[in-house]
Amino acid sequence: MLQPKRTKYRKMHKGRNDGLAWSGNAVSFGEYGLKATAHGQLTARQIEAARRTISRHVKKGGKMWIRVFPDKPITKKPIEVRMGSGKGNVEYWVAQIQPGRMIYEIEGIPEDIAREAFRLAAAKLSVTTTFVTRTVR
């Protein structure tokens, strides 16, 4: 599962996930990409599940890039614990996603296989996505 090796601080403020993706919004590495069309958070588990789905569908062919990394810790208090006594422990890690953000890229396979692989992977993700093709080489 993806998570940072070390961080400066263990816990993070909730923050706001506004605006559009100004960086990481173009197909930079591969031929085809899976692009987010809504705000949301992708957990490390979701990213890994979608990666496995893509890998299984394309089998040996092609090369894949994961363009997001879960670097935000999400905390949770244990069940049946009273309020107060500080912030809970880190439960899992998420990547914050804005509309336009490229999530996965792939190359070296036909478009129909890439489209189907991304369709199957999109079912594992909590944000709506669209299939995009590289415009300029």
Swiss-Prot record:
GO cellular component, one term: cytosolic large ribosomal subunit
Keyword Nucleotide-binding attached: no
Pfam family, one: Ribosomal_L16
Biological processes per GO annotation: translation
Keywords: Ribonucleoprotein, Ribosomal protein, RNA-binding, rRNA-binding, tRNA-binding
MF-aspect GO terms: rRNA binding; structural constituent of ribosome; tRNA binding
Matching InterPro entries: Ribosomal_uL16, Ribosomal_uL16_bact-type, Ribosomal_uL16_CS, Ribosomal_uL16_dom, Ribosomal_uL16_sf
PANTHER family: 50S/60S RIBOSOMAL PROTEIN L16, LARGE RIBOSOMAL SUBUNIT PROTEIN UL16M
Entry function: Binds 23S rRNA and is also seen to make contacts with the A and possibly P site tRNAs.
Similarity comment: Belongs to the universal ribosomal protein uL16 family.
Subunit annotation: Part of the 50S ribosomal subunit.
This protein's name: Large ribosomal subunit protein uL16
Organism annotation: Xanthomonas campestris pv. campestris (strain ATCC 33913 / DSM 3586 / NCPPB 528 / LMG 568 / P 25)
Lineage: Bacteria, Pseudomonadati, Pseudomonadota, Gammaproteobacteria, Lysobacterales
UniProt gene name: rplP
